[in-house]
């Protein structure tokens, strides 16, 4: 073990630090110098009130910077004053290809050096390279098949249709009409038990796809002729990830090899300090920006869902303005804020998510009313297929599906929800993370598949650094995500703590704050939410299913009560105490109003719980525009007090309610 024990030199002093929750208290901070050895990882687990900041320092002998990354997101070298902050009980690991020296401000309750090489440099990289080859093949199909381009261009995706169900193999006519296997990038599903590291693997694969040296466009690039003309002249590249020439048509295979091996460029510290130059990126046209445009599909509506628990989302990524997903806080499971908030603009320190798609499940367990869960999946798959018909960059880059954790009860249904999602999203690769039985069962299931589209099953070991989390932590994360939606993020450290700590460590340090040290976690600003009182009848609030119904004896003679797991019921809090109690302290999803119900029975009574202005199925597939929190009710005045992220008119007066409760304390 002596060869991997790192020399950590630290100094400790008392400063006033604002914790990640913004309470402000005296904490004991330390400034440590850590040498991170090649292919190993330094594990950090923060507890409540703890925050750390990390930056590169040059080698004292050579003066060169090393390389390091967190779940595939690089810490940019060559900028000593750039700090990366982490808080909100984050659990993460720093790893390095060739070794690096980093400075750590603050201390965690748990931090240690792993005694085995990071999986980043074994199966994770091999998996990425296989996906890279699949993306290049998809791009070549789109580039060389004019008939495919013509088919996609002629497809009409403007018309809104009702997607069919994927209950059986080959079902789902609407989605199948839009789906074409040609030109499709890899569609990868990550499955495994809870706390196995599924989201971490998703972030790693997404980061390496975003940092790829490939050009994700059908044409060769607007700069192709210019670069070819001046190929013999010295040229300054914006980073190692674009150092190859993607526009040489003389030898496609050589170009593929260059792109596949481009990941090796990430390992060289001398190249890392040129990585992702903002000035160079600004000069490049859109078609010449390197990196794939993958889409993360978050199908776990529990803690860590996007943007809040109770949602499932498709998050299209772009390698701009930077090409990585950070991990500053578990409240931002993929390091980004989606535009569904209606208040948080894309951060300049992360990639952008272009027109994300979020749908409301209203629950944190997909097994609860699974028929409803599957129908929401139908709608999400339908929206994704429509997107991929016209967004060819995302099409060739593929899908990365983050699935709910597998539990013992799933085996009794032969992992029915997994099979359903495989059909709906046309999955071609299932990565089983750390679950031997699940790997064997899925292998047996798809060995007998006669559809001709059975996915490939890939088993990978669970990382030794995967952290088991308990129900208390999950509830904290649940509350933190909802709170950060309305209130944003505080800085991990106060300005006073930042200046004091730097000054106490170095007499020559000016009384200014180095870049990133006082940055809000995830670059999400602190918000001032708006509490307002609105008429009770301003919002049309619906829920799926009905907990309590009138007995049959209370119905008209001859009438029967027909209930469905997917029946949408309009709330009536004035006349129903159950609806009133359900509404108080709930988080409501404001959704895009679907087309009006033209086929409803004109003779039906407005008092009928099933009577409303929209088709049930249309409401299940309505896109989320934002959220409000019901903080108080006044039934005498028929008023609701709601909390909104910003003042002004609500984006919609059509709302869906689930079992998502939160108290603003």
From Swiss-Prot:
Region: Disordered; residue ranges are 218-283, 593-615
Primary location class: nucleus
Quaternary structure (record) = Component of a pre-mRNA cleavage factor complex. Interacts directly with PCF11.
Gene3D superfamilies given in the database record: Clp1, DNA binding domain (2.60.120.1030), P-loop containing nucleotide triphosphate hydrolases (3.40.50.300), Pre-mRNA cleavage complex subunit Clp1, C-terminal domain (2.40.30.330)
Name of protein: mRNA cleavage and polyadenylation factor CLP1
Q: Which organism is it from?
A: Malassezia globosa (strain ATCC MYA-4612 / CBS 7966)
The residue stretches assigned to a coiled coil in this entry are: none
Q: Which InterPro entries match?
A: Clp1, Clp1/Grc3, Clp1_C, Clp1_C_sf, Clp1_N, Clp1_N_sf, CLP1_P, P-loop_NTPase
What SUPFAM superfamilies does this protein's entry cite?
A: P-loop containing nucleoside triphosphate hydrolases
């Amino acid at each position: 073990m002596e060869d991997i024990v790192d020399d950590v030199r630290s100094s400790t002093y008392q400063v006033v630090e604002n914790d990640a929750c913004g309470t402000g208290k005296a904490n004991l901070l330390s400034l440590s110098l850590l040498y991170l050895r090649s292919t190993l990882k330094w594990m950090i687990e923060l507890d409540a009130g703890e925050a750390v900041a990390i930056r590169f320092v040059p080698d004292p002998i050579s003066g060169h910077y090393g390389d390091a990354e967190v779940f595939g997101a690089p810490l940019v070298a060559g900028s000593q004053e750039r700090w990366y902050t982490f808080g909100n009980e984050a659990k993460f690991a720093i790893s390095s290809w060739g070794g690096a020296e980093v400075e750590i401000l603050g201390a965690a309750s748990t931090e240690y050096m792993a005694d085995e090489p990071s999986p980043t440099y074994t199966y994770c990289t091999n998996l990425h390279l296989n996906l890279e080859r699949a993306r290049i093949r998809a791009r070549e199909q789109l580039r060389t098949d004019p008939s495919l381009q013509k088919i996609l261009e002629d497809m009409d995706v403007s018309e809104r249709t009702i997607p069919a169900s994927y209950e059986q193999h080959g079902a789902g006519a609407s989605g199948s009409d839009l789906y074409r296997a040609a030109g499709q990038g890899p569609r990868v599903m990550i499955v495994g038990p809870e706390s196995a590291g599924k989201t971490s693997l998703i972030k790693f694969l997404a980061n390496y796809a975003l940092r790829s040296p490939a050009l994700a466009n059908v044409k060769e690039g607007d700069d192709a002729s210019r670069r070819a003309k001046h190929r013999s002249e010295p040229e300054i590249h914006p980073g190692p990830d674009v150092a190859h020439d993607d526009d040489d048509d003389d030898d496609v295979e050589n170009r593929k090899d260059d792109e596949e091996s481009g990941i090796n460029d990430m390992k060289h510290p001398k190249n890392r300090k040129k990585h992702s130059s903002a000035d160079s990126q600004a000069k490049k046209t859109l078609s010449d920006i390197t990196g794939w445009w993958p889409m993360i599909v978050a199908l776990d509506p529990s803690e860590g869902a996007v943007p809040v628990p109770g949602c499932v989302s498709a998050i299209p990524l772009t390698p701009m303005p930077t090409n990585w997903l950070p991990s500053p806080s578990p409240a931002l499971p993929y390091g980004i804020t989606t535009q569904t908030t209606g208040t948080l603009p894309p951060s300049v320190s992360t990639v952008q998510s272009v027109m994300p798609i979020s749908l409301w499940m209203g629950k944190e367990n997909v097994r609860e009313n699974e028929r409803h869960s599957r129908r929401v999946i139908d709608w999400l798959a339908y929206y994704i297929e429509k997107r991929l018909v016209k967004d060819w960059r995302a099409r060739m880059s593929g899908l990365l599906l983050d699935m709910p954790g597998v539990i013992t009860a799933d085996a009794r249904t032969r992992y029915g929800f997994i099979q359903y999602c495989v059909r709906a999203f046309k999955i071609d690769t299932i990565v089983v993370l750390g679950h031997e039985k699940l790997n064997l069962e899925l292998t047996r299931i798809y060995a007998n598949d006669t559809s001709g589209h059975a996915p490939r099953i890939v088993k990978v070991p669970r990382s030794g650094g995967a952290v088991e989390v308990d129900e208390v932590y999950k509830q904290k994360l649940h509350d933190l995500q909802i709170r950060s939606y309305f209130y944003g993020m505080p800085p991990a450290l106060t300005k006073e703590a930042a200046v004091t700590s730097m000054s106490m460590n170095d007499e020559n340090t000016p009384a200014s704050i180095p870049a990133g040290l006082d940055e809000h976690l995830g670059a999400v600003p602190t918000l001032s939410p708006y509490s307002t009182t609105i008429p009770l009848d301003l919002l049309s609030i619906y829920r799926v299913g009905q907990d309590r119904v009138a007995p049959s004896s209370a119905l008209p003679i001859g009438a029967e009560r027909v209930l469905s797991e997917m029946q949408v019921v309009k709330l009536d809090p004035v006349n129903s105490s159950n609806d009133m109690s359900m509404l108080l302290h709930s988080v409501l999803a404001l959704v895009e109003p679907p087309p009006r119900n033209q086929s409803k029975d004109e003779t039906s009574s407005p008092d009928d719980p099933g009577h409303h202005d929209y088709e049930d199925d249309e409401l299940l597939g309505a896109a989320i525009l934002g959220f409000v929190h019901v903080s108080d009710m006044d039934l005498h005045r028929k008023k609701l007090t709601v909390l909104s992220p910003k003042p002004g008119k609500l984006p919609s007066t059509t709302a869906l309610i689930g079992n998502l409760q939160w108290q603003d304390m």
